[in-house]
UniProtKB/Swiss-Prot annotation:
Family: Belongs to the YAP1 family.
Outcome of swapping V84A: Reduced interaction with TEAD4 and transforming ability
Protein name, as recorded: Transcriptional coactivator YAP1
Species annotation: Homo sapiens
Impact reported for W258A: Reduced interaction with PRRG4
GO biological processes: bud elongation involved in lung branching; canonical Wnt signaling pathway; cardiac muscle tissue regeneration; cell morphogenesis; cellular response to gamma radiation; cellular response to retinoic acid; DNA damage response; embryonic heart tube morphogenesis
Length: 504
C-alpha cells in the first residue's frame, strides 16, 4: 500500500478526567469523536534480531549512475516505471465526487450531525484542492456518500465569510481549551472538558457565532449606538447590505464608502466648532431625530460661511473707502503748492502702504506733479502707460539683467518726474527759478545703484544739460527722510509694473 494513502489511525483511548498526552514522535494528536484525524507517517523499519546481519548486494555502480543520467537526459527512451492511476488506488468515492449544493443543509444529513470514529473524514487542509471548492464546505466534514457531518453543523443554512489567515496566539482560547504543537511545529488544540484533541481552532467557531448573532441584534439598540456617535454629515445616508454590513452613501458625490464619515477629522473639527457656538440646546430628555441633527449641523456650517463672506465684504469696503479718501486728499491739494517737498512726501508716503497691502494690484495714487492727462490715465487704468496712443510698453522679459523688476518702459514722459527735483539735495532753491528747471532730472535718482536712467531719452527741445550735471551727486548730503523712503521703495517685493518709478 502506498504510504501516502494509508487511512488515519484509530485514536488512542484516554482516561476520564485526564488531559490527553503529547502526541508521540512522528504521529499527530489523537482524534476524538466527530473530529478529523491527522495523517500518520510510515512506521520505521524494525531492527533485525540479535545476531543477524543484513547484507545488501549491489551490481555495478557505474551502470546504475548511467541509468539515472539517461533517465534525465533522454526522458523518452528511458524506462520510467508507470505510476498507479488514480482510479486504481484505494480512494473513497467522495474523492472523485464533488459535494452537492444541497448537502450543506441540515435536512440532507442522515446521521444527525454525528460520524463514526472509523469513517474516513476529509478536511480542507488534507484533501485534494481539485475535489473541494474553497468556501463550498463550512467547518463540517465529508463522508463517503458526500454528506456533511460533524459537530460544527449549524441549524441554519447561512454561509459566512471565512477568514483566510491564522488567528494570532495572543487571542485567548475558550474555557477548557489548550493549544499545543507537534514535533514538526503544527498546532493542535486540546479540549479538557471532552477529553478530545482537534486540528480546528475553536476561536474560529466563536467568531462565526458572533457574526451570526450580530445581525440579529434589536434595531432599537443599533439606533441608540448610531445616535450616540452623533448625526451623519449633510448629504450622507447610512444603509445596510443583505449580509448585515453597514455602509454609507454620499448623495453629493454619488459615491459609497465603508468608512464612517463621522470618523473624518475634518467633520470632527467642524462639529467641535458648531458645538462651541452659542446655540440654544434642546431639553436633555426630548428625543431628537437624526434628520433634525443633520439639519442643525448644516445650518451651523451655513452660518459660518455667511459670517466669513460678511467679513470679506467688510474688508473690501474698508479698502475701497481708504483709497477714495486718499484720492480726495490728493485732489484737494492746491496746484500752486503741489511742488512743495511736504506735498511730494505726503504723496510718496500715501502711495506705499496701499501698494504693499494690496500686493501691488491696485491703482497707484497719481502724483500731483503729473500732467492732467497722466493723472486721468493713472486713475482709470492699472498702468499709466497702457491704453494710450503716445506711450508704448515693452513686452514682458524674463531674461532682464535688472534685479528689481522684469518690466521696463523705453521712454519716460518729460513731465513725469519733474516734480521731485526739490527733493534731491538740501540746497536752497529759489522758487522763482523753478519754472526754468522743470525739465531738470533729479540728482538723487542718479545716486541710487541699479537705476541706470537713460538721460538721453529725457532731453527736450529746450533742454541744455551740462556735462557736470550728468555726474551722480554722491558728494551731496541727502536728507534722512528721502533715504528712508527710497529704501522702502527698493525693499518692496511687490512693486512691479504698477510701481510709480520706472526702471530702465
Amino acid at each position: 500500500m502506498d504510504p501516502g494513502q494509508q487511512p488515519p489511525p484509530q485514536p488512542a483511548p484516554q482516561g476520564q478526567g485526564q488531559p490527553p498526552s503529547q502526541p508521540p514522535q512522528g504521529q499527530g494528536p489523537p482524534s476524538g469523536p466527530g473530529q478529523p484525524a491527522p495523517a500518520a507517517t510510515q512506521a520505521a523499519p524494525q531492527a533485525p534480531p540479535a545476531g543477524h546481519q543484513i547484507v545488501h548486494v549491489r551490481g555495478d555502480s557505474e551502470t546504475d549512475l548511467e541509468a539515472l543520467f539517461n533517465a534525465v537526459m533522454n526522458p523518452k527512451t528511458a524506462n520510467v516505471p508507470q505510476t498507479v492511476p488514480m482510479r486504481l488506488r484505494k480512494l473513497p468515492d467522495s474523492f472523485f465526487k464533488p459535494p452537492e449544493p444541497k448537502s450543506h443543509s441540515r435536512q440532507a444529513s442522515t446521521d444527525a450531525g454525528t460520524a463514526g470514529a472509523l469513517t474516513p473524514q476529509h478536511v480542507r487542509a488534507h484533501s485534494s484542492p481539485a475535489s473541494l471548492q474553497l468556501g463550498a464546505v463550512s467547518p463540517g466534514t465529508l463522508t463517503p456518500t458526500g454528506v456533511v457531518s460533524g459537530p460544527a453543523a449549524t441549524p441554519t443554512a447561512q454561509h459566512l465569510r471565512q477568514s483566510s489567515f491564522e488567528i494570532p496566539d495572543d487571542v485567548p482560547l475558550p474555557a477548557g481549551w489548550e493549544m499545543a504543537k507537534t514535533s514538526s511545529g503544527q498546532r493542535y488544540f486540546l479540549n479538557h472538558i471532552d477529553q478530545t484533541t482537534t486540528w480546528q481552532d475553536p476561536r474560529k467557531a466563536m467568531l462565526s457565532q458572533m457574526n451570526v448573532t450580530a445581525p440579529t441584534s434589536p434595531p432599537v439598540q443599533q439606533n441608540m449606538m448610531n445616535s450616540a456617535s452623533g448625526p451623519l454629515p449633510d448629504g450622507w445616508e447610512q444603509a445596510m447590505t443583505q449580509d448585515g454590513e453597514i455602509y454609507y452613501i454620499n448623495h453629493k458625490n454619488k459615491t459609497t464608502s465603508w468608512l464612517d464619515p463621522r470618523l473624518d477629522p475634518r467633520f470632527a473639527m467642524n462639529q467641535r466648532i458648531s458645538q462651541s457656538a452659542p446655540v440654544k440646546q434642546p431639553p436633555p430628555l426630548a428625543p431628537q431625530s437624526p434628520q433634525g441633527g443633520v439639519m442643525g449641523g448644516s445650518n451651523s456650517n451655513q452660518q459660518q460661511q455667511m459670517r466669513l463672506q460678511q467679513l470679506q465684504m467688510e474688508k473690501e469696503r474698508l479698502r475701497l473707502k481708504q483709497q477714495e479718501l486718499l484720492r480726495q486728499a490728493m485732489r484737494n491739494i492746491n496746484p500752486s503748492t503741489a511742488n512743495s517737498p511736504k506735498c511730494q512726501e505726503l504723496a510718496l508716503r500715501s502711495q506705499l502702504p496701499t501698494l504693499e497691502q494690496d500686493g501691488g494690484t491696485q491703482n497707484p495714487v497719481s502724483s500731483p506733479g503729473m500732467s492732467q492727462e497722466l493723472r486721468t490715465m493713472t486713475t482709470n487704468s492699472s498702468d499709466p502707460f497702457l491704453n494710450s496712443g503716445t506711450y508704448h510698453s515693452r513686452d514682458e522679459s524674463t531674461d532682464s539683467g535688472l534685479s528689481m523688476s522684469s518690466y521696463s518702459v523705453p521712454r519716460t514722459p518729460d513731465d513725469f518726474l519733474n516734480s521731485v527735483d526739490e527733493m534731491d539735495t538740501g540746497d536752497t532753491i529759489n522758487q522763482s527759478t523753478l519754472p526754468s528747471q522743470q525739465n531738470r532730472f533729479p540728482d538723487y535718482l542718479e545716486a541710487i545703484p541699479g537705476t541706470n536712467v537713460d538721460l538721453g531719452t529725457l532731453e527736450g527741445d529746450g533742454m541744455n544739460i551740462e556735462g557736470e550735471e550728468l555726474m551722480p551727486s554722491l558728494q551731496e548730503a541727502l536728507s534722512s527722510d528721502i533715504l528712508n523712503d527710497m529704501e522702502s521703495v527698493l525693499a518692496a517685493t511687490k512693486l512691479d509694473k504698477e510701481s510709480f518709478l520706472t526702471w530702465l
